[in-house]
């Protein structure tokens, strides 16, 4: 496990609320970066989700069959989300066209705010707006713990969570290595 210093955000009623346990307990990460790769034999079932992007386009897990998918949970007022946005875009630009896709999951903002964030921070990949029923967040939370915002997941070509980064991404090379590992796996 790799540990680095960071800060993470918490939006009341956001993804963390979707993660709340039966006793109402919630898990948060603050003060460190956690990277966890999951060996193929230990991965859970593929994540099935469907939502609508900030531009009104329908998107679902079916759109990413046989691709490595990077999913980033974020919102516009989250300081670490702002800091890591250029790093995520750098990794996206590096791997774009190599059976890799990127998808944001905005857990708090209206579509216009998400579009402004993308324009202001140079983010070119789409984001699902998941503020109404939290169905996308809940689909992922059913398969893997999402304890803080931002959280970044790498899904293998089968749609299973292969790696999880909890907290602010500190270096593009961390995510790039996780994507490369997932790309090298045989299905």
Show the residue positions of the predicted features.
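Short, ordered coil/turn segments that flank beta-strands lining enzyme active or ligand-binding pockets
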Residues: 7, 54-55, 157
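Extracytoplasmic
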Residues: 44-46, 64-66, 97-100, 112, ...
């Amino acid at each position: 496990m790799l540990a680095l210093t960071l800060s993470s955000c918490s939006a009341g009623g956001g993804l963390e609320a979707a993660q709340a346990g039966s006793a109402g307990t919630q898990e948060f990460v603050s003060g460190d970066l956690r990277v966890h790769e999951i060996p193929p034999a230990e991965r859970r079932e593929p994540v099935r989700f469907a939502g609508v992007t900030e531009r009104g386009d329908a998107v679902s897990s079916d759109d990413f069959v046989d691709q490595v998918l990077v999913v980033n949970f974020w919102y516009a007022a989250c300081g670490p989300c702002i800091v890591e946005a250029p790093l995520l875009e750098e990794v996206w630009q590096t791997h774009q066209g190599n059976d890799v896709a990127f998808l944001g999951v905005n857990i708090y903002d209206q579509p216009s705010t998400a579009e402004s964030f993308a324009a202001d921070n140079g983010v070119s990949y789409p984001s699902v707006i998941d503020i109404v029923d939290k169905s996308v967040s809940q689909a992922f939370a059913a398969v893997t713990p999402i304890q803080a915002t931002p959280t970044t997941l790498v899904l293998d070509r089968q749609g299973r969570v292969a790696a999880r980064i909890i907290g602010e991404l500190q270096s593009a090379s961390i995510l790039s290595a996780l994507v490369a590992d997932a790309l090298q796996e045989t299905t």
